[in-house]
Amino acid sequence: DLMRYNDGNIYSVGIKNPNPLSIIAYRQDWLDKLGLEVPTTLDEYYKVATAVAKEDPDGNGVDDTFAFGGYQNVDTTWFDHIFGAFGSLPNYWMEKDGHIVNGSIQPGMKDALVYLNKMYKDGLIDPEFVTDDPKRWQQKVKSGVYGAGVTKIHIFDQNNWSNYYEPFIQAYPEGKH
């Protein structure tokens, strides 16, 4: 009843999801060094993630690389590429068979969580991905800890260049983009 207006009706104003599209940015130099292509399937993705985390692509002789990481207080968009591959997107409403359904309760959700759990247990995801603060995460990205990163496509907008993209160009001037 708290949501009801004084005429007894419940009103809502829908909004477009404010989150821009997520993309995966790969370290092409590491893919080249490992003899791998940008993955196009979940099996290929797991193979690339394993190679990045286990085959020392930075060549420093230390087990210190991960497929990717993240930082605290960020929503599930870090993993939208995984959830989406299984037909489930947490926190999103989607059209399915002519109905609007919640992505968090779709049948593929469990399979996506099992897949992510395996990646985590196998050491492919930085175990500090939920505790690092944004500055620590960015420092890890710049220092070459991650072979890929999930980010918002808007960082490649020229208006955001100095805030997001330029620091990585400075850290990896030979990088392909």
Task: List the predicted regions and their residue ranges.
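Extracytoplasmic/secretory soluble proteins
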Residues: 1-177
